[in-house]
Amino acid sequence: MQIPRSIGTHDGSFHADEVTACALLIIFDLVDENKIIRSRDPVVLSKCEYVCDVGGVYSIENKRFDHHQVSYDGSWSSAGMILHYLKEFGYMDCEEYHFLNNTLVHGVDEQDNGRFFSKEGFCSFSDIIKIYNPREEEETNSDADFSCALHFTIDFLCRLRKKFQYDRVCRGIVREAMETEDMCLYFDRPLAWQENFFFLGGEKHPAAFVCFPSCDQWILRGIPPNLDRRMEVRVPFPENWAGLLGKELSKVSGIPGAVFCHKGLFLSVWTNRESCQRALRLTLQDRGII
């Protein structure tokens, strides 16, 4: 007889794929954390409602999600399998599926299946989860370490989902600005504009800047050509503004209320909106656009 709301996965060393798979099922309220069973015993696993990363079977109908068997020739690990399951059974829409896949799960799949290896100086999500495993000489409970890694992953996934939901709320505001503004998009608060701008066809939009208040100051930020070149801008600030602060920037630009201009010429900060607008106008004149 199966144990409802239970999930079985292998014992011993754990990896990001089964930890992520378990976390996803917990977040979507399909399993209980206290019903995670770590074993390789087929009899024990047969009693679990879900089984992931062990058992040699991939069957979405039977809630079995292993990718190690020869009969499976796909690209997913157990994390990708569970994410796909959640989409197929209507627990998330396609947009959220692609967001979670592109921001986290695809990378977990790639590293678990040996198609990606971290470089020195870079630490992936899978590398972080690996660190939670106890060292051989440590007399610790692997289940307790698994639980620590699981809680970290649950928190991370919850924050990703909140970001996704927030981005969707911001999209309508960005769309309205794109429909009413041309060279500069004005917002009344900081928001997730960049991804939404390009999601809404921003590569073909004429806007070169965004302007919004932040921490009692005003930000004038250049828009990149596309997301792949996000550290570049369509229209840079004047060269002689690079790296200047406060009075020095005000003196060179002739604009009062200056705070800072990034040396990369993609961001400037001002004390008020009017100074931002003057900086915008001067920059467009400097670049021969108006």
Curated annotation (Swiss-Prot):
Pfam families: MYG1_exonuc. Coiled coil: none annotated. Belongs to the MYG1 family. This is MYG1 protein CPn_0489/CP_0265/CPj0489/CpB0509.
